[in-house]
Amino acid sequence: MQSKKEYSLFFIFGTILFAGIVLTQGNKPDLDQQSLFDQLQKESITELILKTNLEQIIANANDVDYGDGKLTFVNGDTSNVVYDIKVKPRGVTRKQICDFPPLKIKFSKTDLEANGMDGYKTLKLVTHCKEGEDFEQVLLKEYTAYKMYNVLTEKSFRVQLVKITYEDANQEIEPSTHYGFLIENKQELADRIGAELKEKDNSILTQIDANQYRLFTLFQYMIGNTDWNLSKQHNVKLLIENEKISPLPVPYDFDFAGLVNAPYATPYSTLPIENVKQRFFQFKGNRNTDFRSTYDLFNAKKAEIMCLHTDFNLLDEPVKIEMTNYLKAFFDLINEHQVADEKLSLNGAYL
């Protein structure tokens, strides 16, 4: 589906040019060396062509096996770059709901090394889910939510907006073009911030980094997202920075957030809210925790956060207005510290 809108975006990451760099020896990739994701990062949209057995992916969303494919990076005036890849459906809820599931793309380490890149072999691709303008807007809103967390902290998943043409290898399905976005590899995130992934290790939850936890929970409240759980590590990655003992929570998957408001999103039945547009604060900790420094950070970054959607030309104007009003209610609350402290209690808060 081709969009008639302009593509100009005003986001924080600068264009990173392709460069050949020799791979160093060692167990971890060289941090001075660019990754595939580094080379994809730019202010404008990355154009891709994915050719694979689309019929197999769409009909068998629960398939855990990779299928063969080719991914072409469209470089405009220069030569296109084509990679042989493996691709499979991924996700949980979206894999069941979407007509076109999210995808996991795996590159050959040999190909990456041959092109002067380090060894982060997999990337997640968030897809359009279903046909139609409404679902395109949902995807763009979720992308914007990731960018908002990037503004607040570098300890976050980077994302890259793409315009991707899907081609069926067997020519059984007509080619189609949609927006999507790629999510940074989790090991790359850990290496970038000098941390270690701690998956399936709940023993560390009692000593979670207090500053980052306040930021994490207040951000989830800002976007109205309750679809996360620390103890189950649901939609959260835990990382421990070098020489520290307190893990950092890093969120992902925001389609159930009120700010995104996906048509299929509903809150858990155990929560005292009727729809995802209602905020509920899920901070678990000392009732007397002082959030003022966290409020100050959000206020300092407010202009950048708001510009991410107001200056985003691919979002429809009614969507921008709705997002502005939703975020304004949050900022109005945190700027009334006494009221905010009463609402943001240990037992949750509504707004």
Outline where the language-model segments fall.
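Bacterial Sec-dependent N-terminal signal peptides
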Residues: 1-29
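Phosphate/dinucleotide-binding and metal-coordinating scaffold of catalytic cores
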Residues: 24-351
